[in-house]
Amino acid sequence: MKSSKLRAGAVLACTLALTACGGGDDGQLAIGGSFSGVTKTGLVLTNNGGSDYAVVPTTSGVGNWFFPNLVETDSKYNVEVKSKPDNVETCQVIAPTGRAVFATNRVDVACTFKKHDLGGSVANLKGELVLVNGADKVTIPAGATSFAMAKVPQDGVYGIAILTQPAGQTCTIANASGTMGAAAINNVAVTCTP
């Protein structure tokens, strides 16, 4: 008798726990996940061609999202990208399809920023010059008239600095810092004297 009461209590506890997690018979299950690479508005996700959701961007570009419309228990979901921010090249949905048995928070969306060239001109360089932009380091040989750094994500900041001056010369940089727009930056100017 005592063990049957314990079993009944355990079943009740499990049922209540499942209902609280979205696993009950009411079918009110949330579909969502995480996102990365979203710093601007424009990412819209859709489930089965409807139930659109505009992801709210974050400064860091990462966060979580959930469709506001809940789905029925055992229904199929198919998450797709309807539109993407203008500073993004592509957005990939990871684990986009499934069947809603419990609330789902594992439909992740990974967006890749557009990247653009960063470079410019060099004047009167007689020795070797080393430039840096964050972790990117470029060695420019004597006599060079131009240079290129690693591509920078759109809307990302850049700041080119001189790490090593050429022997016997002093070089300065014009237009060394800014924010990458929708096109390449090629007006950075390095001038060396004498």
Set out the residue ranges of the language-model regions.
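Short, ordered, surface-exposed loop/turn motifs in non-cytosolic proteins
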Residues: V38-S51, N124-K137
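A short, amphipathic beta-strand motif
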Residues: L29-G37, L118-A123, I160
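Bacterial signal peptide processing site
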Residues: G22-D26
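C-terminal motif of bacterial Sec signal peptides marking the signal peptidase cleavage site
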Residues: A17-A20
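Bacterial N-terminal signal peptides that target proteins for export
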Residues: M1-A10
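Short, acidic Ser/Thr/Gly-rich low-complexity loop/linker segments typical of extracellular
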Residues: G50-N64, D136-T145
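Short Pro-Gly-centered beta-turn/loop motif in secreted/extracellular proteins
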Residues: N64-E80, S146-A161, P166
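Structured interaction patches on ligand/partner-binding surfaces of diverse proteins
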Residues: T58, K82-K114, Q165-P194
